[in-house]
Amino acid sequence: MKVKNVKPYKRRSLELIEMAIDMTKNREYQLAREYTKLAITYSRKFRFKIPIEYKRSICRKCYVPLVIGLTERRRIKNKVVIRTCLLCGWVRRYELKRDSKEGKGIPPRHKNRQERTQ
């Protein structure tokens, strides 16, 4: 089934995720879990991507929004961010971004490298 207008579903999905984050802050984890499952179902059914900042804020095992201090623990070790869900124990690791000026596609032996990276 091809849906012509996906925008209302995408907007509703993002609203559901934001409501789920609010429910998590109020410690209503079951309701927050239902909201995030519904938002993910919308994105799969109507074929749109959930933005990465929302996608990374949801536990992939128990579908609870990750809020630092309530449902998530963050640690940084060796330039890697380690995120742990405090409800189910799910662990995810993300590399920290490198310095954006250094690797802009300029070879190390280029004659103007110093000028371009400053």
From Swiss-Prot:
Reactions that this protein is recorded to catalyse: Endonucleolytic cleavage of RNA, removing 5'-extranucleotides from tRNA precursor
GO terms classed as biological process: tRNA 5'-leader removal
Main location: cytoplasm
GO molecular function annotation: ribonuclease P activity; zinc ion binding
Cofactor note: Binds 1 zinc ion per subunit.
Pfam families, per database record: Rpr2 (PF04032)
Transmembrane segment boundaries: none
Gene3D superfamilies: 6.20.50.20
Cofactor or coenzyme needed: Zn(2+)
Enzyme Commission no: 3.1.26.5
Keyword Endoplasmic reticulum: no
Keyword line: Cytoplasm, Endonuclease, Hydrolase, Metal-binding, Nuclease, tRNA processing, Zinc
Location relative to the cell: Cytoplasm
InterPro entries assigned: RNP4 (IPR016432), Rpr2/Snm1/Rpp21 (IPR007175)
Annotated coiled-coil segments of the chain: none
Residue positions binding Zn(2+): 59, 62, 85, 88
EC top class, as a word: hydrolase
A GO cellular-component term linked to this record: cytoplasm
Assigned protein family: Belongs to the eukaryotic/archaeal RNase P protein component 4 family.
Assembly behavior: Consists of a catalytic RNA component and at least 4-5 protein subunits.
HAMAP family per UniProt: RNase_P_4
Biological function: Part of ribonuclease P, a protein complex that generates mature tRNA molecules by cleaving their 5'-ends.
Protein name per UniProt: Ribonuclease P protein component 4
